[in-house]
Amino acid sequence: MKYLHSMVRISSVDDSLDFFCNKLGVIELRRHDDDKGRYTNIFLAAPGNEDAMVELTHNWDPEEYAGGRNFGHLAYGTENIYTLCQHLMDNGVTINRPPRDGRMAFIRSPDNISIELLQQGDALAPAEPWLSMPNTGSW
């Protein structure tokens, strides 16, 4: 058995690609538009980790995703959680659970998907402003 990908439904291709690619730093691997099925699939991955993909599915006809069709969270490892969180904040992303422990943070995508950010290797030493930053919303 081989892991293939996780699928997340999105409401806006532009907002989602801005968030995932421009702010979070993942890359678009491929895209497929299905005119008959009226949807677009976009496959993303962290640079250097192209085998672990996230599939963004955009259904062209508006649809509310509720009743168990939502998702727990995605998780990405990073070389420096403080640098990534600062970059995200500088680009307007709310850090819902700051990396107070130097190891873990949570953010949300434009479609409210929870994303866990994990420090690769050992946790960084606790540091400000993260150490005293409160949680914002839910994660």
Question: Which residues fall in each region the model found?
Answer:
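Core segments of cupin and vicinal oxygen chelate
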Residues: 7-51
